[in-house]
């Protein structure tokens, strides 16, 4: 149920829609409480996104940063994306400030591509953190295959609504599409004063 009599919520992964009680009408859009000025759809989606990410588990991510972080960012990244490489250069500033960065491999061009194969190779490397740094700097990664979660990362990206890389998910479920420098990310996380970026959804 929703706060509107006769309107019910439907959930598809991390996506939210609304349907009339008789099942005749479906509404795709934002449900906003004008009294409190809260976007109820965004709040619900944030919880669903976090649930989906938690279900994947950190064992299926490439994790950088402190074991006991102040805040956490989950980043859908493409190993051949220039803006992802720029963000990766900012990661040391984030981790030094107590932010854990968790990478999910999201080859935008699809699964029958060199980028996909490089993503798998990064995952299969003995040192994944080192390998992703090499890949993002344009270096050669030893091409290996092994059991890997890359397809699951892509599926989760579709569920979250990733349209490009990098896509950053904050630990409150807000989604930030595109590159942002460390200072803006730290401000958005409440760890530093400065210009705050507004999440898209």
Regions found by a protein language model. Name each.
Residues 64-85, 100-103:
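Short active-site neighborhood of thiol/selenol oxidoreductases, capturing the structured segment around
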Residues 88-89:
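Histidine-anchored nucleotide/phosphate-binding helix
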Residues 190-200:
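Generic C-terminal helix-cap and adjacent flexible tail
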């Amino acid at each position: 149920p929703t706060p509107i009599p006769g309107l019910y919520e439907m959930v598809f992964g991390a996506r939210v829609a609304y349907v009339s009680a008789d099942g005749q009408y479906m509404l795709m859009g934002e449900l906003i409480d004008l009294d409190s000025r809260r976007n109820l759809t965004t709040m619900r989606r944030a919880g669903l996104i976090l649930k989906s990410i938690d279900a994947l588990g950190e064992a299926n991510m490439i994790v950088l940063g402190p074991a006991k972080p102040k805040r956490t960012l989950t980043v859908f990244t493409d190993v051949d994306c220039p803006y992802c490489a720029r963000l990766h250069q900012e990661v040391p500033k984030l981790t030094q400030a107590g932010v854990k960065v968790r990478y999910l491999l999201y080859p935008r061009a699809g699964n029958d591509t060199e980028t996909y194969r490089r993503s798998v190779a990064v995952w299969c490397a003995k040192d994944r953190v080192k390998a992703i740094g090499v890949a993002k700097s344009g270096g050669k990664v030893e091409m290996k295959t092994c059991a890997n979660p890359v397809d699951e990362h892509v599926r989760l990206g579709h569920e979250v609504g990733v349209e490009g890389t990098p896509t950053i998910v904050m630990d409150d479920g807000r989604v930030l599409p595109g590159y942002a420098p460390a200072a803006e990310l730290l401000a958005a996380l409440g760890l530093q004063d400065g210009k705050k970026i507004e999440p898209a959804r």
